[in-house]
Structures are given as structure tokens and as C-alpha cells.
Amino acid sequence: MAANSSVVSVAAAATAVPGVSTVADFSDLQEIKKQLLLIAGLTRERGLLHSSKWSAELAFSLPALPLSELQPPPPLTEEDAQDVDAYTLAKAYFDVKEYDRAAHFLHGCNSKKAYFLYMYSRYLSGEKKKDDETVDSLGPLEKGQVKNEALRELRVELSRKHQARGLDGFGLYLYGVVLRKLDLVKEAIDVFVEATHVLPLHWGAWLELCNLITDKEMLKFLSLPDTWMKEFFLAHIYTELQLIEEALQKYQHLIDVGFSKSSYIVSQIAVAYHNIRDIDKALSIFNELRKQDPYRIENMDTFSNLLYVRSMKSELSYLAHNLCEIDKYRVETCCVIGNYYSLRSQHEKAALYFQRALKLNPRYLGAWTLMGHEYMEMKNTSAAIQAYRHAIEVNKRDYRAWYGLGQTYEILKMPFYCLYYYRRAHQLRPNDSRMLVALGECYEKLNQLVEAKKCYWRAYAVGDVEKKALVKLAKLHEQLTESEQAAQCYIKYIQDIYSCGETVEHLEESTAFRYLAQYYFKCKLWDEASTCAQKCCAFNDTREEGKALLRQILQLRNQGETPTSDTPGTFFLPASLSANNTPTRRVSPLNLSSVTP
């Protein structure tokens, strides 16, 4: 990505941020706290409020510094002193969102701080006008069609300054943001990497870089600075790339070295458990986080997703009311209320709140995906497709949006499109059985039964959360008249259901017992056939067949019909599914490249 020469060349410009240097590890927490307090002030001066808040929260989690260790603010340069009046006035206008006015009074300033605020004010002015035009003239699904008209001018000016080595770490960050907005991804990555070398303490640059990394291979080729901030970046990107085990190891390491009181790290761990669907663990961590930081709004939409999945209506209602009292105009609050109405099956109201969230922040990923789900519930497939596509525009790593598009095209009976989107979802979540089952169903519809069998088998091997894969595989074997394999799958399905203490509410349980009863009957295994037939009598849809089969077995026994001599034990575990030959070993590697729409 960014060449070392370019990093060195830009490093000379970093002198505009005096005193900002980092240590490579966590051996000196006092020094790290000083750095965090310093960068919190520097980002606040430049209007980078989210980065300032992140740094301040992290600093707060570390032990307090003695008076002798507290550092004074960096001294003013000659250029800063000349621009101090214009900067002070412009910053006041900036803080009340009068961006054009701020830029007007900063025009011609020479200090790097004033220059950054001048360019950033112009950028935010363009963003504000774009959002205002979007809200006034178009529905929320059309946001991507309105552009920030200031971007091209900003790119030309920042590029000229960059070539002249006149950008400090903050200027590089803004240049990268402009490039990303213009979809110049490779150039943006190079610039963000430079920004992390020049000013490694600025979390905003790391976060922007994180949003552009699409896979682990891409991450390997980045030339990143050797600093403790890199550990926070890696933990975050691992979570985003669904590499949850690696992410949790990183966060545990950060806790061990001294950040155990960081609400940011605790929330990220909860998000990681949410991503691997360890719902109980994630709920427990979020509840503990709410006790420690009761007015926190960040990540509460993720917490509401967990409450939604568990159908915890009263808890979700309490959370929605609580967040409304704190700040009802936050994006996360709107998403929580949307989830609350969705759980109550009031999908029109839910979609309305997700639209409100998007008016507040058009790039808020969760709202696009959740709105797509609501449109699916309302059978509005065209609107759902638009919403999911916008989610992918915001973040191509969002497997839920790819999966949602697959479901939508499945409803529209367009299997080739459906296959493409399910494959993209599977690439992002290779060990998620839901993606594999969906792929298998798609291959079935395309009559690619070998690929379908691979998918169902793999879904079972990685841990079938919905208990569907074995039944679907069994039915596929039935269709191919592979009776022994079908019986093995049904037996394993029954054993799995009973071993985990499931009730008899599974829809396919009666199907499994009916097939096994008939299979054992054909094999003249009267005891096993009789056991399965008796089980069939417990279900309404198979009761009569079970009784009829029991009568036939009794009649054949009375006639002296003898069972087969090689009778296995009841509900035997076939060798192919035994503990010493697990499904994971038998399943062939999944090749999903055979069909390309």
C-alpha cells in the first residue's frame, strides 16, 4: 500500500503537532495516558469530536496522573499566533454548525490547525447541503444519488498540498476521507496508512482505514506503524472481518495490560459475542455495561437486536423508553424503537423509525439492513432490495445485507441471483450454517444436487443452529433413492434432537420417524420398525400411518416372518457418523465456483 518513502516524506510535516509520539507497547501506561489526553485535546480543537470522545474514554479507564505528570497544552507556533483570532471566531461558528461562515473567516490562514478547520468546514458544509437536499427532495432510499459538490475542489487542493508535503496527520486524514467519498479506494487506503504513520494517536484515521479493508489478505499487505494503537485497530478489524476468536484474544490482551475499565472494550467484546450468536454471553455483558455506564447510547442498537432475537418484549420496551429519555434523536435510539415495533409486528412503524435513523445518518449501516428486513416483512421486495443494496454500499462486509438480498431474490424466484448473493454471504461467514443451508436450497432448485449435498453436509459439520441441515440432506438422499444414507441422516437428526433435550415440537421429527419406520420395515427389522411406528403415533400427521404399520408388523410376526439376522441395535449410530469418523472429516471441501450467474 503506502510506500515507505512516502511515509518518510510526509513525516516532516508532522512537526505541526508537537509532542505527539507513541510507544510501541503497553509497558508505560502513564505515558499512554498522557498521549491520550493530548490527542483528545488536539482532535477537539479541530472539531473531530468522535475521535476526541474515544481518546477521552480510553484515558478515563486508566489510573489518574499525579499533578507533576500532567502536561501543559502544546505551545503555539508563530503561525498559530497569527491566526488565533480568526481560528477562535471560526471555531465558534463551526461548533454551532455554521460551516460556510467558519470557512469564510479562515480563508487565507497559514497555520496547519486553521487550514484543517478551513478545509473540514468546507467538507462538512457540502455534506450538510447534500443531506438537506436528500431529505427535501427524495425518499430515504435514494440517498446515494445526491453528491457532495465540494469533494472535487477539496481533492484538487488537498492533492496539491500533499504533493508539496504540506499536510500533517489531520490533513492526511481529511484527504483520505475525500478520496473515499469519491470512491478512490486504493488512493484512500494509501493516504490513511500515511496518516497512521504521521499521527498514530488519531483513532479516526485507523477507523477509516478499517472501513476500507475487505479481507484478511488485504490486511496483511498494509505497512502499519509499530505502536500500541495498532492493537486496538487489529482488534476492531478482526471483529469487522468476523474473525471473532482473534478479536477476543486481542481484547483480552488489552484488558490484561490495564484497560479493564474501558467501556469501549467491554462493548466491543459484547458485539463480538453477538456476531458469533453467543446470545446469552452477549446479553450478560451488555447488561453489565448498562450498570457501569447507564447513559451510554453507542451499541445499544446491537443490544436491542439481541433482545429482539430472544423476544424479550418488556426489556426491549424499557430500553427504548430509557434511550428516548436520554436522547430521542440519536440514530441508535431510532433503531431500538424500530426493533421494538418490529417485535410487536408493527412493521410500518418500525420502517418509519429506521427511515428517521437514516435521515440523521445516511451511512448508518444497521438502519439500512433493518429497514430491508421490515420491507421484507411487508412483502415490499423492491424497497427491500434497495435498502440492502444501500447497506452494501456503506459496508461490503455486511453479510446480513447479502443474505437479505438472497432471500429477496428467492421470493422473486430468481435462483441465479439468489445463488450469487448467498455465496457472497457465505464468503463472509464461512462457518455460519444458515448461509450453507440457504446455498444448499438454492443448488437444489437449480438441480445441482451434488453441490446441495455438500452444502447441507458442511452446514451440519460446522454446527447446524437451526437443526435443518440433516433433514434436508436426508430428503435429498430420498430423492436420489439412497435409502441407507437417508436413514443415517434421519437417525442422527433424531439423536441430536434428543441429546440436546429438545421437545417434540420439531416439525420434521414425525417425517424422520415415518421414514425410519418404513426403512426398517423394508429391511424386516421388526423391533426397530415397531419402535419408530409407535413414535409416529405421537404426531397428528403420521398417527394413522404409524397404526397401519404396527398392524402390518403384528400380522407378519403372527405369520412367522423372521427378522433379518444382522439386526443392529435400536437407533444404531452408523459407522460413517460415529465419533471416530466425524462429519467434518468426511465432508469434502466446499467448491462454490461451479455456477456463476
Swiss-Prot record:
Modified residues (Phosphotyrosine): Y273
Post-translational modification: Phosphorylated. Phosphorylation on Thr-562 occurs specifically during mitosis.
Assembly information from the UniProt record: The mammalian APC/C is composed at least of 14 distinct subunits ANAPC1, ANAPC2, CDC27/APC3, ANAPC4, ANAPC5, CDC16/APC6, ANAPC7, CDC23/APC8, ANAPC10, ANAPC11, CDC26/APC12, ANAPC13, ANAPC15 and ANAPC16 that assemble into a complex of at least 19 chains with a combined molecular mass of around 1.2 MDa; APC/C interacts with FZR1 and FBXO5. Interacts with FBXO43; the interaction is direct.
InterPro entries on file: APC8, TPR-like_helical_dom_sf, TPR_rpt
Modified residues (N6-acetyllysine): K467
A single Gene Ontology CC term: anaphase-promoting complex
Encoding gene, per UniProt annotation: Cdc23
GO-annotated biological processes: anaphase-promoting complex-dependent catabolic process; cell division; protein branched polyubiquitination; protein K11-linked ubiquitination; protein K48-linked ubiquitination
Protein name: Cell division cycle protein 23 homolog
Presence of the UniProt keyword Ubl conjugation in the record: yes
Functional summary from the UniProt entry: Component of the anaphase promoting complex/cyclosome (APC/C), a cell cycle-regulated E3 ubiquitin ligase that controls progression through mitosis and the G1 phase of the cell cycle. The APC/C complex acts by mediating ubiquitination and subsequent degradation of target proteins: it mainly mediates the formation of 'Lys-11'-linked polyubiquitin chains and, to a lower extent, the formation of 'Lys-48'- and 'Lys-63'-linked polyubiquitin chains. The APC/C complex catalyzes assembly of branched 'Lys-11'-/'Lys-48'-linked branched ubiquitin chains on target proteins.
Organism for this UniProt entry: Mus musculus (Mouse)
